[in-house]
Amino acid sequence: MKGGLEVKNLNQQLCRKKGGRHLAGDAAMITQKLEISGIPALLYGKESRKVYLYVHGKMGCKEEALPFAELACPAGYQVLAVDLPEHGDRRGSSEKLLPWVAVPELEAVYSYAAERWKNVSLRATSIGAWFSMLALQEKPLRGALLLSPVVDMENLITNMMQWQM
């Protein structure tokens, strides 16, 4: 259980960081703070024609995209990360982490990206991957990297209801 606690503490530390310059290997990682349709966002990396949309999972935040950006940016990508409702800079806000809230928001973020970059890819985790698959199923993506995606929400909920407390 200690490992889980360490990951939670690391996520909390990452989620407290703000935009600016982050150390990425031996060079500073350029970040820009943005707001897309009222959604707090960070853009990592120097100007490019390619971008990854980074969508975190439960208990995550846009700042946790930094380790991924440290890999993607040297490969010629920028990374656009957003805070889902009730996460990161949106903690305590009135928006709830519900499909009918998160899906239209991710559609708006995709539209923002598609207007600015030639190639849009997705990197999403867990519940963020599920929301992204709902929002972007008809959108052209260059690629998708899904980490622990929820692919069958109904089955997940049914199984969770059978867990012993």
Give the role of each language-model region.
Residues 130, 140-165:
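The alpha/beta-hydrolase serine catalytic core
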Residues 122-124, 147:
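Short beta-strand immediately N-terminal to the catalytic nucleophile in serine-hydrolase-like folds
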Residues 49-57:
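Short beta-strand element of the alpha/beta-hydrolase
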Residues 58-70:
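The serine-hydrolase catalytic nucleophile loop
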Residues 124-128, 132:
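Gly/Ala-rich beta-loop-alpha elbow adjacent to hydrolase catalytic centers
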Residues 72-91:
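Conserved alpha/beta-hydrolase
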Residues 19-45:
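N-terminal cap/lid segment of alpha/beta-hydrolase-fold proteins
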Residues 88-114:
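Catalytic nucleophile-loop/oxyanion-hole region of alpha/beta-hydrolase
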